[in-house]
Amino acid sequence: MNAPAYVVGGFVRNFFLKRQSKDIDIVCVGNGIQLAENVAALLQPSPKVVTYSRYGTAMFRFNDIEFEFVGARKESYSADSRKPAVEEGTLEDDQKRRDFTMNALAFSLNPDEFGLFLDSFEGLEDLNNQIIKTPLDPGITFSDDPLRMMRAIRFAAQLGFVLDGDTKQALKKYKDRIGIISQERIAAELNKIILSPKPSVGFLLLFETGLLSIIFPEMLLLHGVEIKNGKGHKDNFFHTLQVLDNLSQVTDNLWLRWAAILHDIAKPQTKRWQADIGWSFHGHEVLGATMVYTIFKRLKLPMDFKMKYVQQLVRLHLRPISLTKENITDSAIRRLIVDAGDDLDDLMLLCKADITSKNQSKVQK
């Protein structure tokens, strides 16, 4: 073909981060589909090439690695869609359309300069400084494809990086653009945030930028403390983040982490003031289990056994704590074992993570 070709994106980023990659993106100045077919024909056994002619892309899987080929291109977007109009471009044009500078890095695959490192937007410096920054003005990057706002926060949570100041401001300014993105795509990024080493990093950024109020308003309602007659309750938003982080230290079970997020979700709706005891949230576990269904349905999360599992844990999350009281009966313990069934161990993990008190005697009990 004699078309200049380059490895770009996540593979190059992960090379410098010394992280494994499951996919390799290859950009050529020419026909990406034709290049994919030519490369596949040279491999044994020859993999099946899947093509997307509208975008000029093709991919195949070989040795458990997914290869994606695309012709270098320019993209332009309309105000109400994230589907771009595409035209042929140069390597630099293609790098400009990337979401972040750390994903705009490239290695040449051309025989006369094989392995040459190409960094048009100082992405390696940003990578070394652990900064998430866009190649273009962030307003253009996020307005063109608002899902990139979720990706920025996801990368911050996954890698422990910080958002560049202008990038963070653009997230706040263009947050409403997230409305043109499908719930499925938002949920996919949200799940990646939840599965990150310290999910609170991502949720705090969602909170600070205003995105949380749009994609997950029920969680935002947990924020705040009300004080009456000198008595206040804990901020259930920050408590939830602490529970989530606690649980994330011991499990990578996505749906158990969702149970941590939703275990107190109904506290705003069940909050009551009683002069003799102060604030109460009676029945929040029952209403919360009902809300799991509504939230999963809106976010287009699985409505199968995974949702029911989260409901079960939310409904039962107070039961183990109640067993710490004196004079508890063997029958109460047996009832919990029967009611929790196969989820008992996970329930106990959630219960332990839910203990965020600074009072060591309470923790010990």
Please place each PLM-identified region on the residue numbering.
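Catalytic cores of the polymerase beta-like nucleotidyltransferase superfamily
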Residues: 1-365
